[in-house]
Swiss-Prot record:
It comes from Streptococcus pyogenes serotype M18 (strain MGAS8232). Substrate binds at residues 21-23, 36, 59-62, 119, 157. Belongs to the phosphoglycerate kinase family. Its main location: cytoplasm. This is Phosphoglycerate kinase. The gene is pgk.
Length: 398
């Protein structure tokens, strides 16, 4: 990576500003999935072990008006982080002002402070989300000229807490998580060990057009599953029953199929049901066509076998999007089958591009078998599209 990293700067005695991604799910004030906090630990620990004073910034959820602040404080995160680090985490509970400044100035080497939810600044004119110049300058002024961006999950956004701070410090560098995310995903797409197979699922073609186009150029095969299968089917005149379809994307699907040179591989059968919820019948289709009055909710057994074959010998695999409604045991066989086909390949570099695929791997007990699971759904999608991420572009060149 041609950007400076946290290892390239002297941190001792410095107030180091760090953008982390602590946007974790909370239920009744309790964190239900702490993966993002765990993922940030190596960078935080490195900073404090080097004698730096870590000042952490993160958003949590969406905050547009005062009422939205309810249940969005980072207080539970501060407590969880303190337990994981085995030391106190200072939490002033504000995003600016004398209370924050005094707490920062009182920090000693090796201490950690967490600023309140950066999106609380969005209540008064979207200052965080619109990268307000004054806010970026103010937050930058709280440190000693070093900013570490370790929030891959927001790297595709230009906000005050990443791009804004970066523009106003002497050195803006990548943390370990950001460095690893870029290394795994970008290298997989730009310089893959071949054969390189991409697997794309999820419900909408519209979400993945740019990704499919980019990967058709880069990958040896692109396997398609999930709800978007049926838009590709209908574009070819195949009966899809009541399956999900994007009528306004039929031409796009047809165009992608025509220019794919056979690289785009669609399922050959489906698991169909007579309703999405409250169904009374579930069965495998004979071939591609879905029965009238039914809808496809997973790829079928023949497709699982065909995808298994397509993955044989693969050395690089990037997977983004489940093959079916994996949350329901009746429609998770496709997602499980594809995961198992990926991880059994000898010496494969296997990467999950965040979002629902990451949830599927974790929920179905296969997370530890993958080389890398991205922490950022939207950011990894934009990397797979070949886009430049603003949060990364803003960092200091080596």
């Amino acid at each position: 990576m041609a950007k400076l990293t946290v290892k390239d700067v002297d941190l001792k005695g410095k107030k180091v500003l760090v953008r982390v991604d602590f946007n974790v799910p909370l239920k009744d004030g309790v964190i239900t999935n702490d993966n993002r906090i765990t993922a940030a630990l190596p960078t935080i620990k490195y900073i404090i072990e080097q004698g730096g004073r870590a000042i952490l910034f993160s958003h949590l959820g969406r905050v547009k008006e005062e009422a939205d602040k309810e249940g969005k404080s980072l207080a539970p995160v501060a407590a969880d982080l303190a337990a994981k680090l085995g030391q106190d985490v200072v939490f002033p509970g504000v995003t600016r002002g004398s209370k924050l400044e005094e707490a920062i100035n009182a920090l000693e080497d090796g201490q950690v402070l967490l600023v309140e939810n950066t999106r609380f600044e969005d209540v008064d004119g979207k200052k965080e989300s619109k990268n307000d110049e004054e806010l970026g300058k103010y937050w930058a002024s709280l440190g000693d000229g070093i900013f570490v961006n370790d929030a891959f999950g927001t790297a595709h956004r230009a906000h005050a807490s990443n791009v804004g701070i970066s523009a106003n410090v002497e050195k803006a560098v990548a943390g370990f998580l950001l460095e690893n995310e870029i290394a795994y995903i970008q290298e997989a797409v730009e310089t893959p060990e071949r054969p390189f197979v991409a697997i794309l699922g999820g419900s909408k073609v519209s979400d993945k057009i740019g990704v499919i186009e980019n990967l058709l150029e880069k990958a040896d095969k692109v396997l398609i599953g999930g709800g978007m299968t049926y838009t590709f089917y209908k574009a070819q005149g195949i009966e899809i029953g009541n399956s999900l379809v994007e009528e306004d994307k039929l031409d796009v699907a047809k165009d992608l199929l025509e220019k794919s040179n056979g690289k785009l591989i669609l399922p050959v059968d489906s698991k169909e049901a007579n309703a999405f919820a409250g169904y009374t019948e579930v069965r495998d289709t004979e071939g591609e066509a879905v029965s009238k009055g039914f809808l496809g909710l997973d790829i079928g057994p023949k497709s699982i076998a065909e995808f298994d074959q397509a993955l044989t010998g693969a050395k690089t695999v990037v997977w983004n999007g489940p093959m079916g409604v994996f949350e329901n045991p009746d429609f998770q066989a496709g997602t499980i089958g594809v995961m198992d086909a990926i991880v059994k390949q000898p010496g494969v570099k296997s990467i999950i591009g965040g979002g629902d695929s990451a949830a599927a791997a974790i929920n179905l007990g296969r997370a530890d078998k993958f080389s890398w699971i991205s922490t950022g759904g939207g950011a990894s999608m934009e990397l797979l599209e070949g886009k430049v991420l603003p949060g990364l572009a803003a960092l200091t060149e080596k």
